[in-house]
Structures are given as structure tokens and as C-alpha cells.
A protein has these predicted regions:
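Conserved hydrophobic/aromatic packing and binding residues within compact polymer-binding modules
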Residues: 17, 31-32, 42-45
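Recognition helix of helix-turn-helix/homeodomain-like DNA-binding domains
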Residues: 36-51
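Short basic helix-loop element that most often maps to the first helix and adjoining turn
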Residues: 16-30
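DNA major-groove recognition helix of helix-turn-helix/homeodomain DNA-binding modules
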Residues: 53-71
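N-terminal flexible/basic segments that precede or flank functional cores
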Residues: 1-8, 69-87
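Short, conserved glycine- and acidic-residue-centered signature motifs
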Residues: 10-14, 24, 52
């Protein structure tokens, strides 16, 4: 059975999360506090481990609220949204 469309949109990988934090100069502790996700889960996710869809969504939402844009054009990536861009 195929994944629901909304879940597919949420798929990000741990390398993207670590890169996004780097762009934002965000410490892991700040991401942990903002998402309510445990330290062990964030560490596992950034190291390439799997997480539940709700965890992925929480992490993605926090980073997107701070200006991160997740890209998947060929290879997963991240970029910082320009302040003057209309998305």
C-alpha cells in the first residue's frame, strides 16, 4: 500500500537536519527543546537512524519555521530561505 501523500512530503534525512542546524547556527539542545523530541532520538536521526513520522514532522516544522527549505532535487539538501522571498 503506498504511503499517504502528506507523509511523503515529510520525508527528510538526518544529514539534512544536521545541515539545517548548521545553517541556523542552532545547537542540538535548542532543537530538542523546540520539538520536545528526546536527545537520543535527535542524535539517532542525525546519525542516519529512522524516526517515527510524527517526530520527523515535528523536526521539519521547527526548522522550516526558522527559515529552512528542504530540497530533494537529485540529492537531499537544505537551504536558508531568503528573507525577501515569498514562499
Amino acid at each position: 500500500m503506498p504511503e499517504p501523500k502528506s507523509t511523503k512530503k515529510l520525508h527528510i534525512v538526518g544529514e539534512q537536519v544536521a545541515a539545517a542546524r548548521g545553517l541556523l547556527k542552532m545547537q542540538q539542545a535548542e532543537l530538542i527543546e523546540a520539538t520536545g523530541v528526546s536527545k537520543a532520538t535527535i542524535i539517532r536521526f542525525e546519525a542516519g537512524g529512522s524516526v517515527r513520522p510524527e517526530t520527523m514532522e515535528a523536526v521539519r516544522n521547527v526548522l522550516e519555521e526558522r527559515g529552512i527549505v528542504f530540497t530533494n532535487g537529485g540529492e537531499p539538501g537544505v537551504k536558508l530561505r531568503r528573507k525577501d522571498a515569498d514562499y
